[in-house]
Amino acid sequence: MEELICREGTVHSVIFQNAENGYTVLRLLTEEGEVVTVVGCIPCVAPGEHLTVTGTWEVHPQHGEQLKAQELERTLPEEEEDIFAYLSSGVCKGVGPTTARRIVDRFGLETLDILEAEPERLQEIRGITAKKAMEIGELFRQHMGLRRLMEFLSRYQLPPVLAIRLRQQYGDGAIRVVEKNPYLLSDDVCGVDFSVTDTMALSMGFAEDCTERLEAALTFELTYNENNGHVFLPKDKLLAATCQLLSCGVEQVEAALDALAEHHAVVIQRIANVEAVYLRRLWEAETSACARLLALLEMDADESRFADRTVAEIEKEQGITYAPLQRQAVELAAKVGVILLTGGPGTGKTTTVRGIVALFQKMGLNIVLAAPTGRAAKRMSELTGMEAQTVHRLLGMTWNEAAHQVTFQKTEKEPLEAEAVIVDEMSMVDVSLFSALLRALRPGTRLVLVGDADQLPSVGAGNVFSDLIRSKKIETVFLREVFRQAEQSAIIRNAHRVNLGESPDLKGNQGDFFFLCRRDAQRAVATVLELCKTRLPDNMHIPAEQIQVLTPTRKGPCGTINLNRLLQEALNPRTPGKREILWGERVFRVGDRIMQTRNDYDVVWQKDDGTVGTGMFNGDVGRIAEIDAGGEWLALDFDGRKAPYSVEMLSEIDLAYAQTVHKAQGSEYRCVVLAAMPSAPSLMVRGVLYTALTRARELLVIVGDDAAIRSMAANDRQQKRYSGLKWRLCHAGDASE
């Protein structure tokens, strides 16, 4: 066992501090005059503080001997010069060395107490107004509150960055709130894993059978499964999973579930032969979506008189002749209120959508086009010649901080002006977003839902597009014919082969489709790097920024985590003068390709034409345009939407040189490099391979194991998603809560 070393002294300087995890490197000046380098989790520390550090010596290959902190005690500075160093270090924005010196000279050892409790006394200093005094006091009070909260969290090995979210949600009383019920940390605000909050709560004296623990575990299981695509869980599965999580009896858990239902936190309802348990918001979304869709289906929308003559006019104007199924889809748009249009690549979906748009225009309808992601909306605009926007922006999605939930400007109270709405990439739309869209439609609005039913389902809960098709309650057109021009593309031919359960043709060079066999993961990684850095830019004249690496998985040598690190080094290496920020284990650098990894409804963005909007959403891709000299702010550019991000917001983004196939859904790239190596069984399925192939527009290069690729094509196993939408549509009027 290593000998524990204790050093006591004053923080001389902070060399490095990671805002996300609190990891700090500092210089400690001991009472004996020794300067010691201390490393460890010491959040919110600043020069002038007094530390007592207990730990072990370790030798860093570059920085030499360091004291790795295992335990520490910290107190605020008590000497005037230490108080000056602390105050002038930046702990209180707006107070620099000059102002700090004047404050300390006036108040001496009482400085910190006065700043926090009596900031109005700062007016005693010449040049500090009443307004400035209160501003300084408020900033210092916020700093001290955040510092105490970070220290509290660090005692339970919780990341300091969590303090920011807690303070935003609960204000000055955050510590009291968490002490009263630490299980709140596992809610949607904080997202701490239940096992962590459970350990924390039990150490604080909460009983194993307490109500807070049982209800939190049930909610955690429902939320965890929502994140895996389920709208509800069968009651027996929920009880079994929760009992296993808590190691307790089913009677206690069932009683807690009944209490949650009584308080309307969950809804229990029989769906077919299953007793389904819903989080209330998901139950409301699903039932509302069903009711509103049925109302649209019941309306009299038959405008057949437009169909035959108008479709012929459109063919003549656009210089085309529709295939029978394309004509059927366009004509149906005039006859019924809701239609579904599905088909794979090269089957003419875009041509058909253009025809439907032209039909609606001739009918004099006000048309709105939308898609789930910014990239999909941009592609829809390019293909139709009309403006398309994200569903989120169309509905005016915002975050209501007081209610802690998503809200929409457009609802039944203030519906969309549109008389016809066309939504593309419907396989990406989850039940909550679909419900919100339907709420915003006026009675009589025509709705056209377009997508590829064979692609992966939405990231969010539900299997909406598939449920709608399988219900057979809505007029559906399946485009199956691959047109001659599209057949010339090996990408499209191979995508359809995969969709039929056949292996793609893995001959080396097929024009726009290449396969490079690499059965060793490290060789595959090296090939991916070489393709992106030199071979494709030099030989195919495709710039690196137009190449997207896709992979089924996040983990492993060919996962996004490892590939992003290596691709960043290859494509955007560290150079003198190029600014970067270390955030956890990741480095973010000017010029990096990045992705938004969770919805942020408050981000304000602006385009060059002056258009201003709010909201960045999970899956949005952009780049880092700028990092400020102080490393506190970044300027991000998401396809022309430019937004400032504070360093605390870096937890919302990740590198995007490599993306998972699921994240890439709805996007299309000039060139795709697919790293296809064996991975988790749930990812080695046909839907993942098919979706990956259909992301490439001009060139697809598969690097990987031929056996793994054939296995994926043959494996049609689809992960079951618990959803009641299809059943509700088929049994309208039968469901009862």
PLM feature segments, named:
Residues 14, 53, 596, 624-627, ...:
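A generic structural signal for residues embedded in beta-strands
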Residues 48-50, 591, 619:
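Loop/turn positions that initiate beta-strands
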Residues 355, 359, 363-365, 371-383, ...:
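Conserved helicase motor core of SF1/SF2 NTP-dependent helicases
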Residues 270-345, 351, 357:
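Pre-Walker A segment
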